[in-house]
Amino acid sequence: MAEKENTKRNRREEILQALAQMLESSDGSQRITTAKLAANVGVSEAALYRHFPSKTRMFDSLIEFIEDTLTSRINLILQDEKDTFHRLRLILLLILGFAERNPGLTRIMTGHALMFEQDRLQGRINQLFERIEAQLRQVLKERRLREGSGFDHDETLLASQLLAFCEGMLSRFVRSEFRYRPTQEFETRWPLLACQLQ
């Protein structure tokens, strides 16, 4: 029984990895059909539906992976780091680095892969970025408590500026067919971003 469950889980993971790889390839700029995905995995469409009730559920699983990975690592940063600027830098670097290591998933994060899918999938991505923006805002607000001084500008504006930088770098990565890495020149860009926060 346990062996059958492992085989099923492995097949699910294989399907999700194939979908992510297709999103990374030139197929990712077009609608990915279950027929194409089944051919890529080497199974029938019926076999896909034994593991996932719909293609939407496959995208849900990939979005869940993105959410879990980013949220858990942001929480670790907040737990381990106390300096505001260091926290912000690490959170941005986390988002950019995750995207760089997972180009196919970046198409989901930017919404490109979701254009032909159900609207609620884009809603989930929107909520993820809203939660990240809220965490950035909280880090900025906590500076006054932690370090005794706040910022000259509204924390909401600053948080949205930081997130807009990340989203812009992810869009550039997708638009360039993954040539321009999101972390490229980050160490040069970060001081410019940090200056805007002063």
UniProtKB/Swiss-Prot annotation:
GO biological process: cell division; negative regulation of division septum assembly
Disulfide topology: none
DNA-binding region: 33-52
Subcellular location: Cytoplasm, Nucleoid
Purpose of the protein: Required for nucleoid occlusion (NO) phenomenon, which prevents Z-ring formation and cell division over the nucleoid. Acts as a DNA-associated cell division inhibitor that binds simultaneously chromosomal DNA and FtsZ, and disrupts the assembly of FtsZ polymers. SlmA-DNA-binding sequences (SBS) are dispersed on non-Ter regions of the chromosome, preventing FtsZ polymerization at these regions.
NCBIfam families with a match to the protein in the record: PRK09480.1
Protein name per UniProt: Nucleoid occlusion factor SlmA
Gene source species: Edwardsiella ictaluri (strain 93-146)
